[in-house]
Amino acid sequence: MSHFAIVAPPLYSHAVALHALALEMAQRGHRVTFLTGNVASLAEQETERVAFYPLPASVQQAQRNVQQQSNGNLLRLIAAMSSLTDVLCQQLPAILQRLAVDALIVDEMEPAGSLVAEALGLPFISIACALPVNREPGLPLPVMPFHYAEDKRALRRFQVSERIYDALMYPHGQTILRHAQRFGLPERRRLDECLSPLAQISQSVPALDFPRRALPNCFHYVGALRYQPPPQVERSPRSTPRIFASLGTLQGHRLRLFQKIARACASVGAEVTIAHCDGLTPAQADSLYACGATEVVSFVDQPRYVAEANLVITHGGLNTVLDALAAATPVLAVPLSFDQPAVAARLVYNGLGRRVSRFARQQTLADEIAQLLGDETLHQRLATARQQLNDAGGTPRAATLIEQAIAGSESVS
Protein backbone atom coordinates (compact mmCIF):
# COMPACT_ATOMS: atom_id res chain seq x y z
CA MET A 1 0.00 0.00 0.00
CA SER A 2 1.13 3.55 -0.74
CA HIS A 3 1.50 6.77 1.24
CA PHE A 4 -0.05 9.79 -0.51
CA ALA A 5 0.31 13.47 0.33
CA ILE A 6 -2.44 15.92 -0.65
CA VAL A 7 -1.46 19.47 -1.63
CA ALA A 8 -4.30 21.95 -2.14
CA PRO A 9 -5.22 25.61 -1.67
CA PRO A 10 -6.75 26.55 1.71
CA LEU A 11 -10.33 26.52 0.41
CA TYR A 12 -12.91 24.55 2.39
CA SER A 13 -14.90 23.26 -0.59
CA HIS A 14 -11.72 21.86 -2.15
CA ALA A 15 -10.70 20.27 1.15
CA VAL A 16 -14.09 18.57 1.53
CA ALA A 17 -13.84 16.96 -1.91
CA LEU A 18 -10.26 15.84 -1.34
CA HIS A 19 -11.12 14.53 2.13
CA ALA A 20 -13.75 12.28 0.57
CA LEU A 21 -11.09 10.99 -1.80
CA ALA A 22 -8.67 10.49 1.10
CA LEU A 23 -11.23 8.40 2.99
CA GLU A 24 -11.75 6.22 -0.08
CA MET A 25 -8.00 5.73 -0.47
CA ALA A 26 -7.71 4.88 3.22
CA GLN A 27 -10.50 2.32 2.93
CA ARG A 28 -8.37 0.61 0.28
CA GLY A 29 -5.45 0.38 2.68
CA HIS A 30 -3.43 3.44 1.68
CA ARG A 31 -2.16 6.20 3.97
CA VAL A 32 -3.00 9.83 3.18
CA THR A 33 -1.50 12.98 4.71
CA PHE A 34 -3.06 16.40 4.14
CA LEU A 35 -0.68 19.31 3.57
CA THR A 36 -3.27 22.07 3.46
CA GLY A 37 -4.94 24.54 5.79
CA ASN A 38 -8.53 25.56 6.55
CA VAL A 39 -9.50 21.98 7.42
CA ALA A 40 -10.02 22.28 11.18
CA SER A 41 -13.41 20.56 11.10
CA LEU A 42 -12.01 17.82 8.87
CA ALA A 43 -8.93 17.37 11.07
CA GLU A 44 -11.30 16.32 13.85
CA GLN A 45 -12.00 13.27 11.69
CA GLU A 46 -8.31 12.26 11.62
CA THR A 47 -7.89 8.49 11.54
CA GLU A 48 -4.98 6.07 11.57
CA ARG A 49 -4.73 6.33 7.78
CA VAL A 50 -5.82 9.95 7.14
CA ALA A 51 -3.58 12.49 8.87
CA PHE A 52 -3.17 16.27 8.85
CA TYR A 53 0.46 17.39 8.93
CA PRO A 54 1.31 20.37 11.19
CA LEU A 55 2.59 22.88 8.66
CA PRO A 56 5.37 25.41 9.37
CA ALA A 57 4.29 28.86 10.55
CA SER A 58 5.35 30.44 7.25
CA VAL A 59 3.01 28.15 5.29
CA GLN A 60 0.14 28.69 7.73
CA GLN A 61 0.50 32.47 7.44
CA ALA A 62 0.58 32.31 3.64
CA GLN A 63 -2.56 30.15 3.68
CA ARG A 64 -4.33 32.59 5.99
CA ASN A 65 -3.45 35.42 3.62
CA VAL A 66 -5.11 33.56 0.73
CA GLN A 67 -8.22 32.94 2.83
CA GLN A 68 -8.39 36.59 3.90
CA GLN A 69 -8.10 37.84 0.31
CA SER A 70 -10.63 35.38 -1.14
CA ASN A 71 -13.36 38.01 -0.88
CA GLY A 72 -11.13 41.01 -1.46
CA ASN A 73 -9.17 42.76 -4.17
CA LEU A 74 -8.23 40.50 -7.09
CA LEU A 75 -4.66 41.76 -7.32
CA ARG A 76 -4.11 41.19 -3.61
CA LEU A 77 -5.53 37.67 -3.97
CA ILE A 78 -3.12 36.92 -6.83
CA ALA A 79 -0.24 38.26 -4.72
CA ALA A 80 -1.33 36.02 -1.83
CA MET A 81 -1.55 32.99 -4.13
CA SER A 82 1.93 33.76 -5.45
CA SER A 83 3.33 33.97 -1.92
CA LEU A 84 1.72 30.66 -0.95
CA THR A 85 3.12 28.87 -4.00
CA ASP A 86 6.53 30.39 -3.22
CA VAL A 87 6.65 29.26 0.40
CA LEU A 88 5.30 25.80 -0.44
CA CYS A 89 7.99 25.31 -3.07
CA GLN A 90 10.54 26.16 -0.38
CA GLN A 91 9.07 24.00 2.38
CA LEU A 92 7.50 20.98 0.67
CA PRO A 93 10.68 19.14 -0.43
CA ALA A 94 11.87 18.62 3.14
CA ILE A 95 8.36 17.81 4.39
CA LEU A 96 7.74 15.20 1.70
CA GLN A 97 11.12 13.57 2.28
CA ARG A 98 10.46 13.50 6.03
CA LEU A 99 7.07 11.87 5.46
CA ALA A 100 8.52 9.40 2.94
CA VAL A 101 5.49 9.67 0.67
CA ASP A 102 5.19 7.56 -2.44
CA ALA A 103 3.04 9.93 -4.52
CA LEU A 104 1.12 13.20 -4.43
CA ILE A 105 -2.52 14.08 -5.05
CA VAL A 106 -2.42 17.71 -6.19
CA ASP A 107 -5.24 20.21 -6.54
CA GLU A 108 -4.83 21.95 -9.90
CA MET A 109 -5.13 25.34 -8.22
CA GLU A 110 -1.87 24.91 -6.27
CA PRO A 111 1.03 24.31 -8.69
CA ALA A 112 3.62 23.94 -5.92
CA GLY A 113 2.56 20.32 -5.45
CA SER A 114 3.29 19.33 -9.03
CA LEU A 115 6.54 21.34 -9.21
CA VAL A 116 7.95 19.75 -6.07
CA ALA A 117 6.74 16.26 -7.01
CA GLU A 118 8.45 16.51 -10.38
CA ALA A 119 11.62 17.87 -8.77
CA LEU A 120 11.74 14.93 -6.33
CA GLY A 121 10.88 12.37 -9.00
CA LEU A 122 7.58 11.50 -7.31
CA PRO A 123 4.48 10.56 -9.33
CA PHE A 124 1.55 12.94 -8.92
CA ILE A 125 -2.10 13.09 -9.93
CA SER A 126 -3.95 16.33 -10.74
CA ILE A 127 -7.44 16.85 -9.29
CA ALA A 128 -9.83 19.55 -10.55
CA CYS A 129 -12.05 20.38 -7.58
CA ALA A 130 -13.22 23.45 -9.50
CA LEU A 131 -13.64 23.60 -13.28
CA PRO A 132 -10.64 22.00 -15.00
CA VAL A 133 -7.92 24.45 -16.03
CA ASN A 134 -7.11 22.67 -19.32
CA ARG A 135 -7.04 25.23 -22.13
CA GLU A 136 -8.41 24.69 -25.60
CA PRO A 137 -8.54 26.92 -28.68
CA GLY A 138 -12.04 28.30 -29.13
CA LEU A 139 -13.07 27.96 -25.48
CA PRO A 140 -13.17 30.66 -22.79
CA LEU A 141 -11.01 30.13 -19.73
CA PRO A 142 -12.76 28.45 -16.77
CA VAL A 143 -12.86 31.74 -14.85
CA MET A 144 -14.58 33.75 -17.58
CA PRO A 145 -18.36 34.39 -17.69
CA PHE A 146 -18.68 33.96 -21.45
CA HIS A 147 -21.15 31.66 -23.12
CA TYR A 148 -20.02 29.12 -25.69
CA ALA A 149 -19.96 30.44 -29.24
CA GLU A 150 -18.03 29.79 -32.44
CA ASP A 151 -18.40 33.08 -34.32
CA LYS A 152 -15.35 35.27 -34.98
CA ARG A 153 -16.40 37.91 -32.48
CA ALA A 154 -16.70 35.36 -29.68
CA LEU A 155 -13.38 33.72 -30.53
CA ARG A 156 -11.71 37.11 -30.50
CA ARG A 157 -13.27 37.84 -27.10
CA PHE A 158 -11.93 34.56 -25.74
CA GLN A 159 -8.42 35.33 -27.01
CA VAL A 160 -8.35 38.85 -25.61
CA SER A 161 -9.71 37.75 -22.23
CA GLU A 162 -7.05 35.03 -22.08
CA ARG A 163 -4.29 37.59 -22.62
CA ILE A 164 -5.78 39.86 -19.95
CA TYR A 165 -6.01 36.96 -17.50
CA ASP A 166 -2.40 35.94 -18.12
CA ALA A 167 -1.29 39.54 -17.59
CA LEU A 168 -3.14 39.70 -14.27
CA MET A 169 -1.64 36.35 -13.23
CA TYR A 170 1.90 37.48 -14.15
CA PRO A 171 3.16 37.52 -10.53
CA HIS A 172 1.96 33.96 -9.99
CA GLY A 173 3.41 32.92 -13.34
CA GLN A 174 6.80 34.35 -12.38
CA THR A 175 6.74 32.40 -9.13
CA ILE A 176 5.99 29.19 -11.03
CA LEU A 177 8.75 29.96 -13.55
CA ARG A 178 11.34 30.80 -10.89
CA HIS A 179 10.85 27.55 -8.99
CA ALA A 180 10.69 25.46 -12.16
CA GLN A 181 14.10 26.89 -13.08
CA ARG A 182 15.41 26.37 -9.53
CA PHE A 183 14.33 22.72 -9.63
CA GLY A 184 15.87 22.21 -13.08
CA LEU A 185 12.49 21.64 -14.74
CA PRO A 186 11.29 22.80 -18.17
CA GLU A 187 9.92 26.36 -18.22
CA ARG A 188 6.28 26.89 -17.31
CA ARG A 189 4.20 29.80 -16.09
CA ARG A 190 0.54 28.69 -16.03
CA LEU A 191 -1.58 26.30 -14.00
CA ASP A 192 -2.44 24.23 -17.06
CA GLU A 193 1.29 23.74 -17.70
CA CYS A 194 1.65 22.07 -14.29
CA LEU A 195 -0.83 19.22 -14.80
CA SER A 196 0.02 15.57 -14.30
CA PRO A 197 1.03 13.47 -17.33
CA LEU A 198 -0.31 10.38 -15.51
CA ALA A 199 -3.93 11.28 -14.71
CA GLN A 200 -6.03 14.44 -14.58
CA ILE A 201 -9.27 13.90 -12.68
CA SER A 202 -12.21 16.31 -12.80
CA GLN A 203 -15.21 16.53 -10.48
CA SER A 204 -17.26 17.73 -13.42
CA VAL A 205 -19.01 15.81 -16.21
CA PRO A 206 -19.52 16.60 -19.92
CA ALA A 207 -23.13 17.63 -19.18
CA LEU A 208 -21.70 20.57 -17.20
CA ASP A 209 -19.04 21.61 -19.68
CA PHE A 210 -18.67 23.22 -23.07
CA PRO A 211 -17.87 20.94 -26.03
CA ARG A 212 -14.31 19.65 -25.60
CA ARG A 213 -12.15 18.50 -28.50
CA ALA A 214 -8.58 18.52 -27.23
CA LEU A 215 -8.49 16.96 -23.77
CA PRO A 216 -5.51 14.64 -23.17
CA ASN A 217 -6.10 10.90 -22.99
CA CYS A 218 -5.24 10.96 -19.28
CA PHE A 219 -8.13 13.35 -18.53
CA HIS A 220 -11.13 11.79 -16.78
CA TYR A 221 -14.52 13.19 -15.78
CA VAL A 222 -15.53 11.27 -12.64
CA GLY A 223 -18.27 13.48 -11.20
CA ALA A 224 -18.62 14.65 -7.62
CA LEU A 225 -16.03 13.53 -5.08
CA ARG A 226 -18.23 12.44 -2.18
CA TYR A 227 -17.73 9.76 0.45
CA GLN A 228 -21.46 9.15 0.85
CA PRO A 229 -23.74 8.56 -2.17
CA PRO A 230 -26.35 11.26 -2.85
CA PRO A 231 -29.60 10.80 -0.90
CA GLN A 232 -32.38 9.02 -2.72
CA VAL A 233 -35.30 11.34 -2.03
CA GLU A 234 -38.60 11.25 -3.84
CA ARG A 235 -39.66 14.86 -4.36
CA SER A 236 -43.33 14.74 -3.42
CA PRO A 237 -45.80 17.09 -5.14
CA ARG A 238 -46.24 20.28 -3.14
CA SER A 239 -48.67 23.14 -3.47
CA THR A 240 -45.96 25.49 -2.18
CA PRO A 241 -42.56 25.24 -3.93
CA ARG A 242 -39.55 24.70 -1.71
CA ILE A 243 -36.28 26.52 -2.47
CA PHE A 244 -32.83 26.04 -0.97
CA ALA A 245 -30.43 29.02 -1.08
CA SER A 246 -26.73 29.06 -0.23
CA LEU A 247 -23.83 31.27 -1.27
CA GLY A 248 -21.14 28.89 -0.05
CA THR A 249 -18.61 29.10 2.77
CA LEU A 250 -16.81 32.22 1.50
CA GLN A 251 -19.84 34.35 0.56
CA GLY A 252 -22.24 33.64 3.43
CA HIS A 253 -21.79 37.16 4.80
CA ARG A 254 -23.80 38.81 1.99
CA LEU A 255 -26.82 39.87 4.03
CA ARG A 256 -28.37 42.19 1.44
CA LEU A 257 -28.24 39.54 -1.25
CA PHE A 258 -29.85 37.01 1.09
CA GLN A 259 -32.55 39.57 1.93
CA LYS A 260 -33.26 40.09 -1.76
CA ILE A 261 -33.42 36.33 -2.33
CA ALA A 262 -35.84 35.88 0.60
CA ARG A 263 -38.15 38.64 -0.65
CA ALA A 264 -38.08 37.32 -4.22
CA CYS A 265 -38.96 33.79 -3.09
CA ALA A 266 -41.80 35.06 -0.90
CA SER A 267 -43.17 37.16 -3.76
CA VAL A 268 -43.66 34.05 -5.92
CA GLY A 269 -45.23 32.09 -3.05
CA ALA A 270 -42.26 29.83 -2.37
CA GLU A 271 -40.74 28.63 0.90
CA VAL A 272 -37.00 29.20 1.16
CA THR A 273 -34.34 27.76 3.45
CA ILE A 274 -31.23 29.93 3.61
CA ALA A 275 -27.88 28.45 4.70
CA HIS A 276 -25.33 31.18 5.45
CA CYS A 277 -22.42 28.95 6.54
CA ASP A 278 -21.71 31.01 9.68
CA GLY A 279 -21.40 34.16 7.60
CA LEU A 280 -24.14 36.07 9.46
CA THR A 281 -24.57 37.14 13.06
CA PRO A 282 -27.64 35.80 14.91
CA ALA A 283 -29.35 39.19 14.53
CA GLN A 284 -28.64 39.30 10.80
CA ALA A 285 -29.91 35.75 10.37
CA ASP A 286 -33.11 36.60 12.27
CA SER A 287 -33.69 39.61 10.01
CA LEU A 288 -34.17 37.27 7.05
CA TYR A 289 -37.41 35.93 8.52
CA ALA A 290 -38.93 39.40 8.20
CA CYS A 291 -37.95 39.31 4.52
CA GLY A 292 -39.88 36.09 3.94
CA ALA A 293 -37.41 33.30 4.71
CA THR A 294 -38.97 30.08 5.98
CA GLU A 295 -35.83 28.72 7.66
CA VAL A 296 -32.40 30.27 8.28
CA VAL A 297 -29.50 28.06 9.35
CA SER A 298 -25.71 28.09 9.43
CA PHE A 299 -25.06 24.65 7.97
CA VAL A 300 -27.36 21.85 6.85
CA ASP A 301 -27.14 18.42 5.30
CA GLN A 302 -26.87 20.15 1.93
CA PRO A 303 -27.33 17.13 -0.38
CA ARG A 304 -30.60 16.25 1.38
CA TYR A 305 -31.95 19.80 1.36
CA VAL A 306 -31.04 20.14 -2.31
CA ALA A 307 -32.71 16.83 -3.13
CA GLU A 308 -35.94 17.89 -1.41
CA ALA A 309 -36.02 21.33 -3.06
CA ASN A 310 -37.80 22.35 -6.25
CA LEU A 311 -35.06 24.88 -6.98
CA VAL A 312 -31.56 25.73 -5.74
CA ILE A 313 -30.32 29.32 -5.65
CA THR A 314 -26.54 29.32 -5.41
CA HIS A 315 -23.41 31.36 -6.05
CA GLY A 316 -22.47 28.78 -8.65
CA GLY A 317 -19.86 26.91 -6.62
CA LEU A 318 -19.16 23.59 -8.31
CA ASN A 319 -19.89 21.47 -5.22
CA THR A 320 -23.38 22.93 -4.77
CA VAL A 321 -24.14 22.68 -8.48
CA LEU A 322 -23.06 19.03 -8.49
CA ASP A 323 -25.34 18.36 -5.51
CA ALA A 324 -28.19 19.89 -7.51
CA LEU A 325 -27.45 17.83 -10.62
CA ALA A 326 -27.20 14.66 -8.53
CA ALA A 327 -30.77 15.37 -7.38
CA ALA A 328 -31.97 16.64 -10.79
CA THR A 329 -32.86 19.95 -9.13
CA PRO A 330 -32.83 23.07 -11.35
CA VAL A 331 -30.37 25.82 -10.48
CA LEU A 332 -30.52 29.60 -10.45
CA ALA A 333 -26.92 30.78 -10.30
CA VAL A 334 -25.95 34.16 -8.84
CA PRO A 335 -22.19 34.04 -9.53
CA LEU A 336 -19.87 36.06 -7.32
CA SER A 337 -16.19 35.12 -7.79
CA PHE A 338 -13.59 32.53 -8.83
CA ASP A 339 -14.93 30.09 -11.43
CA GLN A 340 -18.58 30.71 -10.49
CA PRO A 341 -19.41 32.89 -13.56
CA ALA A 342 -17.95 30.15 -15.75
CA VAL A 343 -19.96 27.43 -13.97
CA ALA A 344 -23.10 29.52 -14.48
CA ALA A 345 -22.34 29.92 -18.19
CA ARG A 346 -22.01 26.14 -18.55
CA LEU A 347 -25.25 25.57 -16.65
CA VAL A 348 -27.12 27.85 -19.02
CA TYR A 349 -25.46 26.40 -22.13
CA ASN A 350 -26.52 22.87 -21.17
CA GLY A 351 -30.07 23.95 -20.25
CA LEU A 352 -29.79 22.95 -16.58
CA GLY A 353 -30.69 26.30 -15.07
CA ARG A 354 -30.41 30.04 -15.42
CA ARG A 355 -28.13 32.79 -14.20
CA VAL A 356 -28.82 36.25 -12.84
CA SER A 357 -26.55 39.09 -11.77
CA ARG A 358 -26.07 39.70 -8.06
CA PHE A 359 -26.96 43.33 -8.86
CA ALA A 360 -30.34 42.36 -10.35
CA ARG A 361 -33.47 43.95 -8.92
CA GLN A 362 -35.72 41.91 -6.65
CA GLN A 363 -38.39 41.70 -9.34
CA THR A 364 -35.89 40.39 -11.90
CA LEU A 365 -34.80 37.73 -9.43
CA ALA A 366 -38.43 36.81 -8.75
CA ASP A 367 -39.13 36.53 -12.48
CA GLU A 368 -36.19 34.14 -12.93
CA ILE A 369 -37.36 32.02 -9.99
CA ALA A 370 -40.90 31.83 -11.35
CA GLN A 371 -39.66 30.88 -14.80
CA LEU A 372 -37.53 28.03 -13.47
CA LEU A 373 -40.28 26.71 -11.20
CA GLY A 374 -42.65 26.59 -14.16
CA ASP A 375 -40.25 25.20 -16.77
CA GLU A 376 -41.22 21.56 -17.40
CA THR A 377 -38.67 21.23 -20.22
CA LEU A 378 -35.80 21.22 -17.71
CA HIS A 379 -36.60 17.84 -16.24
CA GLN A 380 -35.35 15.63 -19.08
CA ARG A 381 -32.05 17.49 -19.36
CA LEU A 382 -31.58 17.33 -15.59
CA ALA A 383 -32.35 13.61 -15.61
CA THR A 384 -29.73 13.09 -18.32
CA ALA A 385 -27.14 15.04 -16.33
CA ARG A 386 -27.96 13.04 -13.18
CA GLN A 387 -27.50 9.79 -15.05
CA GLN A 388 -24.17 11.00 -16.41
CA LEU A 389 -23.06 11.81 -12.86
CA ASN A 390 -24.15 8.37 -11.65
CA ASP A 391 -22.29 6.67 -14.49
CA ALA A 392 -19.09 8.72 -14.08
CA GLY A 393 -17.94 6.66 -11.11
CA GLY A 394 -17.32 9.39 -8.53
CA THR A 395 -14.83 8.87 -5.72
CA PRO A 396 -14.32 5.10 -6.21
CA ARG A 397 -13.39 5.61 -9.86
CA ALA A 398 -11.06 8.47 -8.97
CA ALA A 399 -9.30 6.22 -6.46
CA THR A 400 -8.99 3.42 -9.02
CA LEU A 401 -7.49 5.81 -11.58
CA ILE A 402 -4.96 7.01 -9.01
CA GLU A 403 -3.98 3.45 -8.13
CA GLN A 404 -3.57 2.55 -11.80
CA ALA A 405 -1.48 5.64 -12.51
CA ILE A 406 0.84 5.05 -9.56
CA ALA A 407 1.17 1.31 -10.14
CA GLY A 408 2.26 1.68 -13.74
CA SER A 409 3.85 5.15 -13.53
CA GLU A 410 2.37 5.82 -16.94
CA SER A 411 -0.54 7.76 -18.38
CA VAL A 412 -3.95 6.25 -17.60
CA SER A 413 -6.38 6.62 -20.51
UniProtKB/Swiss-Prot annotation:
Pfam family, one: Glyco_tran_28_C
GO BP term (any one): carotenoid biosynthetic process
Single Gene Ontology MF annotation: glucosyltransferase activity
Pathway given in the UniProt record: Carotenoid biosynthesis; zeaxanthin diglucoside biosynthesis
Enzymatic class: transferase
EC code(s) of this entry: 2.4.1.276
This protein's record includes keyword Glycosyltransferase: yes
Keywords: Carotenoid biosynthesis, Glycosyltransferase, Transferase
InterPro entries, per the entry: Glyco_trans_28_C, UDP-glycosyltransferase, UDP_glucos_trans, UDP_glycos_trans_CS
Entry's family note: Belongs to the UDP-glycosyltransferase family.
Protein name, as recorded: Zeaxanthin glucosyltransferase
Source species of the chain: Pseudescherichia vulneris
Name of encoding gene: crtX
